[in-house]
């Protein structure tokens, strides 16, 4: 009786991880950056380290094992794996992703916490001069770049003009 219950519990755990939004987001990013390689990588959620984001890079049963406490940590682990195990690079303007059909396995387990609760990115010049001309593909690349570099708080200027407007009204400026 205990064995079937244990098997059922394991099955629900596996199904739960497969449906977890952090895991799904991680695999989606991996497929966008390195199409077809996602099947060689296993993603797993772990608890934060003293309230900080954390990730681990290792291998398990012939697969690359990336662990993180959320989608950003998993994406950071993927980026660090690409850089330091595959000698690959993802940047704003292009990628250097020359690696073999079978991904190399990490030789040792790496565990890092990600510094800072909030990791801010972008500035008003980027938003005003550059991003205004981006299409969805370019935005997706930028969002992936942010996730792979631990960014969890991009500049959001949406609605800022309303704050400025109301502030000026409070200081007796008029619409004229």
Regions found by a protein language model. Name each.
Residues 1-21:
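Bacterial Sec-dependent N-terminal signal peptides
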Residues 4-5, 59-61:
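Short hydrophobic "helix-edge" motifs at membrane interfaces and signal-peptide entry regions
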Residues 20-36:
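Short N-terminal segments immediately surrounding and downstream of signal-peptide cleavage
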Residues 29, 35, 46-50, 60-176:
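Feature activates predominantly on carbohydrate-active enzymes
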Residues 39-43:
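A short, Trp-centered hydrophobic/proline-enriched beta-strand micro-motif
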Residues 52-56:
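Extreme N-terminal leader/anchor segments
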């Amino acid at each position: 009786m205990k064995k079937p219950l244990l098997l059922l519990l394991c099955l629900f755990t596996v199904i739960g991880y497969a449906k977890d939004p952090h895991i799904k987001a991680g695999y989606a990013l991996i497929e966008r950056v390195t199409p077809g390689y996602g099947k060689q990588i296993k993603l797993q959620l772990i608890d934060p380290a003293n309230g900080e984001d954390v990730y681990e890079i290792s291998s398990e049963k012939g697969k690359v094992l990336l662990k993180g406490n959320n989608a950003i940590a998993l994406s950071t682990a993927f980026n660090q794996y690409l850089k330091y195990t595959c000698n690959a690079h993802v940047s704003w303007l292009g990628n250097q992703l020359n690696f073999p059909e079978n991904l190399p396995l990490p030789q040792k387990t790496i565990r890092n916490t990600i510094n800072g609760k909030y990791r801010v990115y972008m500035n008003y010049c980027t938003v005003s001069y550059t991003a205004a001309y981006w299409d969805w593909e370019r935005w997706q690349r930028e969002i992936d770049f942010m996730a792979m570099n631990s960014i969890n708080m991009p500049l959001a200027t949406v609605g800022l003009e309303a704050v400025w407007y109301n502030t000026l009204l409070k200081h007796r400026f008029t619409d004229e």
